[in-house]
């Protein structure tokens, strides 16, 4: 029986390695897409006479976090939630081992101030999550985009288009909404 367990764990390990490679490749392309979005927004706002000093992209040296600041909005993307093999639950039982790129509302570094372990990190990530892109080990298999405010409805994206589509969908979700004046309970809205 231990032989079966080791075979199962070895397959998980291989899937984890391949998913990590695919996830990192997509994340690197997302950084390029975010730079492009940033430049387009700078052009659009400067042509209207709006200062663009609050429109920028910042990455960490390990390329595991990228933050885009768009005027008063801050959006962070991270791969730091991939510290062990994990699968995306499937109703049919064919769970998909995958890497995950999380999009969160706010500045990752500010949100994680004082975090001491992975459990606490995940609680804060999930509390601020906007969407997640699940990247499978097999590069020919579609990635799965889940958007939190759409009841985690799943969108399937091929791994070529996934970086661009994920970036655009998250930017649209965050910047396409707005905030109400605070009056008791804090609320936001999406268009």
Question: Where are the model-predicted features located?
Answer:
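Residue-identity detector for glutamine
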Residues: 12, 17, 35, 53, ...
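Short, structured protein-protein interaction patches enriched in aromatics and acidic/basic residues
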Residues: 49-74
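Intrinsic disorder/low-complexity polar-acidic segments
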Residues: 66, 70-191
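Contiguous, amphipathic alpha-helical segments that mediate oligomerization or scaffolding
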Residues: 2-57
């Amino acid at each position: 029986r231990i032989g079966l367990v080791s075979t199962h764990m070895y397959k998980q390990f291989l899937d984890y390695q391949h998913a990590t490679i695919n996830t990192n490749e997509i994340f690197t392309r997302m950084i390029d897409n975010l730079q492009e979005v940033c430049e387009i927004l700078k052009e659009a706002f400067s042509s209207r006479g709006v200062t663009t000093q609050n429109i920028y992209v910042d990455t960490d040296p390990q390329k595991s976090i990228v933050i885009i600041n768009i005027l008063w909005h801050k959006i962070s993307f991270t791969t730091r939630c991939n510290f062990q093999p994990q699968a995306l639950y499937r109703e049919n039982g064919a769970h998909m081992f995958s890497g995950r790129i999380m999009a969160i509302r706010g500045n990752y570094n500010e949100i994680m101030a004082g975090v001491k372990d992975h459990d606490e990190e995940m609680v804060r990530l999930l509390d601020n999550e906007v969407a997640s892109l699940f990247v499978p080990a097999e590069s020919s298999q579609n990635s799965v985009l889940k958007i939190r405010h759409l009841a985690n409805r799943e969108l399937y994206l091929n791994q070529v288009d996934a970086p661009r589509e994920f970036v655009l969908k998250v930017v649209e979700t965050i910047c396409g909404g707005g905030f109400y004046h605070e009056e008791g309970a804090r609320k936001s809205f999406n268009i």
